Regions:
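Hinge/lid segment of periplasmic solute-binding proteins
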Residues: 112-160, 188-189, 298, 364-367, ...
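Glycine-centered hinge/linker elements that transmit conformational signals in sensory
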Residues: 194, 233-264
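Mature extracytoplasmic/periplasmic domains
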Residues: 269, 287, 316-394, 430
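Extracytoplasmic/periplasmic solute-binding protein
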Residues: 150-154, 159, 186-237, 276
């Protein structure tokens, strides 16, 4: 191929796929490691190749960027006649992906969420790719197994707080920047300010975006401030009933039902539509902002355990038993090279040490000020902890969500509910 020297090796069909599948909730991964196959056009006979990559985003700007990179690649590699980006619904992305795999319709490349990374990486479904020294070690950890890399950490997106400064002023409340200056940017203050916003304006105070009383792992952006964990470091013991988690969940329960600082179950509020004063979300959501209100972007509030950073991650992997592994790995190398990473960083923060400075990030994130980039983005990428992950994630995720349901009632017994969560999931953690 005539593309620049790839960052990753180009194996033959299935050459670098490990063959030690683990028990998975998604049988599709086992199906792939057992029999392989993809629905992309085959290049094994020297004919033209079609590559397909599953992604979660349907955003026009995102797709324009991705298709532009694909066009550049095809110009240099005419044997690849087409590169398709197949958007799957975000709320059912992993299920849809594993269903495709189980049905013999595996893509050549796939976007993989952090919560399903352990299953994909440990299953043997992915082709090994070459490590890149420019990518921060912490960003690669989730995508490695026994010292080898099986997916490129495509997006390492720190969580922070977007604030509607106009709404806060209307409610007579301090902005996060003012609270930071006073040394009072804490979750306790968020509850007070959020409750006051609700009282004065009728709008929501604080929204944990994409939580919606379903995506419980997004609450890590709160409970990490208490030093809480859902399970032990080795993944074998439930920790929902530990004092730190009990205190964090008690705070959340009070913020929702006592202070009314956060939307209650059954209600929604979109910060970017002007319906909330503050929201916890990732830098990539900045693309949703317009000039309809004044805003700021600041680090997560401090909790009793002090300051902390949380990141969401997505990896890009090559399904290893397909017909076009060599071409897929080569395209992945091109897509994630230094030049393209700089362009992708506008929407999908890159964990490259060579690009982690405010001046470089400002070129692809013009909406954010250098101080915001330094404090939230660079600090978050360098120091952030990835949201909770575990093998058998789909089954485990559903079990936790169901066991937490009784918590979201005004008269809930927080401690007992969390004990019940552990009773529900401990057998799964021990598998």
């Amino acid at each position: 191929m005539s593309s620049p020297a790839p960052l990753h090796p180009r194996p033959g069909r299935g050459a670098l796929v490990r063959g030690k599948p683990v028990a998975l909730a998604a049988a599709g991964l086992l199906a792939l490691t057992a029999c392989g196959g993809s629905d992309g056009g085959s290049g094994s006979d020297g004919g033209p190749v079609t590559l397909r990559m599953t992604i979660w985003t349907g955003n026009e700007e995102h797709l324009k960027l991705l298709n532009g990179i694909a066009a550049d690649y095809r110009e240099q590699n005419p044997e690849v006649k087409e590169i398709k980006f197949d958007t799957l619904p975000v709320e059912s992305y992993t299920t849809a992906l594993t269903t495709q795999i189980a049905g013999g319709k595996a893509p050549d490349l796939a976007w993989i969420f952090e919560n399903s990374a352990p299953d994909f990486v440990a299953s043997g479904a992915l082709a090994e790719i070459e490590d890149d020294a420019d990518v921060l070690p912490a960003a690669k950890k989730l995508w490695q197994h026994e010292g080898k890399l099986y997916a490129y950490p495509f997006s390492t997106s720190p969580f922070g707080v977007f604030a509607n400064t106009d709404m806060l002023k209307e409610a007579g409340q301090p902005t996060p920047a003012e609270l930071i200056e006073q040394g009072r940017w804490t979750w306790d203050e968020v509850a007070k300010v959020g409750g006051a916003v609700r009282d004065e304006t009728g709008e929501a105070g604080m929204v944990i975006r994409d939580f919606d009383y379903k995506m419980w792992d997004n609450l890590a952006t709160v409970w990490d401030g208490w030093g809480a964990e859902p399970w032990s470091e080795d993944g074998g013991t439930c920790a929902f009933d530990e004092p730190e988690m009990t205190d964090a969940m008690t705070y959340l329960h009070d913020a929702v039902f006592a202070a009314e600082a956060m939307p209650a179950p059954g209600t929604t509020a979109d910060f970017f539509a002007g319906e909330a004063a503050m929201t916890v979300t990732q830098i990539s959501r900045a693309s949703l902002l317009d000039d309809s209100f004044g805003w700021d972007f600041v680090p997560l509030p401090e909790g009793p355990a002090g300051s902390y950073d949380v990141v969401g991650q997505a990896g890009l992997g090559v399904l290893g038993n397909g017909d076009n592994v060599a071409e897929a790995v080569d395209f992945l190398a091109f897509m994630t090279n230094e030049k393209n990473s700089a362009a992708l960083g506008r929407y999908f923060p890159q964990a490259r040490s060579s690009q982690l400075d405010a001046d470089t990030l400002a070129k692809s994130n013009p909406q954010l000020k250098p101080a915001q980039l330094e404090e939230v983005v660079i600090g978050g990428i360098e120091n952030g902890k990835v949201k909770p992950t575990h093998t058998n994630q789909a089954e485990l995720f559903d079990a936790v969500r169901a066991a937490l349901d009784p918590l979201w009632k005004p008269d809930a017994d927080v401690a007992k509910t969390l004990q019940d969560v552990c009773s529900a999931i401990q057998p799964q953690l021990e598998k």
